[in-house]
Design a protein with these regions (language model features):
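Short sequence/structural elements of tandem HEAT/ARM alpha-solenoid repeats
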Residues: 13, 28-36, 53, 64-75, ...
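Extended alpha-helical scaffolding segments
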Residues: 93, 101-215
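Amphipathic alpha-helical protein-protein interaction segments
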Residues: 8, 23-27, 44, 59, ...
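Alpha-helical recognition domains of nuclear gene-regulatory proteins
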Residues: 21, 36, 40, 54-57, ...
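Helix-loop junctions that connect tandem helical modules in alpha-solenoid scaffolds
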Residues: 3-4, 36-44, 76-88, 120-136, ...
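Alpha-helical cores of eukaryotic small-GTPase signaling modules
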Residues: 61-98
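HEAT-repeat alpha-solenoid elements in large eukaryotic scaffold proteins
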Residues: 6-15, 45-53, 89-99, 142-147
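Long, low-complexity, highly charged intrinsically disordered regions
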Residues: 1-50, 63, 67, 71, ...
Length: 272
């Protein structure tokens, strides 16, 4: 089963057959299946939409799988959000976009996911207000985890029952952006723009997302889309599970150098 899940190509026939097989044997497969899917999401992140679609199809037939998967994702997020190495921080971002996709296929409550994204940006704003030494790199990273997940479900969420929460997330991000310093680390500047000015990676990301929001065009070629057939079938929240509160741990960073080393700035919005 593990190899079949790993090599699932996302085609309608393969997803339909695999999800039926998994649902039929869920009484004995649940824990293993959840573990396999979580492993695939973190190790093969480019196929995240494929695994989200698979999870949605299995959940529609065996809701206990969806409940266990959401709980596993929440626990993994709490662990990685406080991770001290690059691998854990990457997984936090990957798991966040997986949750966003799960919300579009009826596995997890959409409002719960929007609340989680909002809590990341709120935590960033709280750090900015605190003014503790070295606050900005971690605050930027928390907001980055939330905002960089939006292209993976922005088109759906912006038109869903969570449209207001979606807009509020942008408002919160704008409020945070006004509290942060532009390019606080001179050594982390990216290439100068054509007019010779420095481009701040966080503001660049916000500008790109703002353009997608204004144009209503969230399609990104590098993100494989979930088949429209499945999106229509799975968009209902009838079997969606509560995410619960995701704890965002505080850190013990006490200086700018340590913070910048642990949470380096990004040069562009990366989605893959």
């Amino acid at each position: 089963m593990r190899d079949v899940i790993i090599h699932c190509d996302g085609s309608a026939d393969v997803l339909g057959g695999l999800s039926s097989d998994m649902a039929r044997d869920m009484d004995v497969l649940c824990d293993s299946a959840v573990g396999f899917v979580m492993e695939c999401v973190t190790e093969l992140p480019v196929k995240t939409p494929v695994y989200a679609a698979l999870a949605g199809l299995v959940n529609s037939k065996a809701s206990e799988f969806g409940a266990a998967l959401v709980d596993a994702a929440r626990q993994a997020l709490e662990e990685t959000l406080n991770g001290e190495d690059v691998t854990q921080r990457t997984r936090a971002r990957v798991l966040t976009r997986f949750l966003v996709l799960l919300s579009t296929v009826g596995v997890v409550q959409r409002r719960d996911v929007m609340a989680y994204l909002g809590s990341l940006v709120q935590a960033s704003t709280a750090l900015a207000r605190s003014g503790v030494a070295g606050w900005q790199p971690r605050a930027d990273w928390l907001a980055y985890v939330a905002l960089s997940a939006l292209p993976w479900g922005g088109e759906f969420l912006s038109k869903s029952e969570c449209a207001n929460e979606f807009e509020e997330l942008f408002d919160a991000a704008d409020a945070y952006a006004k509290k942060r310093s532009t390019n606080p680390d001179a050594g982390a500047h990216i290439m100068n723009s054509t007019d010779g000015s420095d481009t701040d990676w966080f503001l660049d990301m916000c500008a790109r997302l703002g353009a997608a929001r204004t144009d209503g065009s969230w399609h990104i070629a590098s993100i494989p889309a979930i088949d429209d057939q499945f999106m229509e079938e799975l968009s209902s929240t009838a079997n969606a599970h509560a995410l619960g509160s995701v704890t965002i741990p505080e850190t013990d960073i006490t200086n700018q150098a340590e913070s910048a080393a642990r949470y380096p700035g990004r040069s562009m919005l990366r989605c893959v």
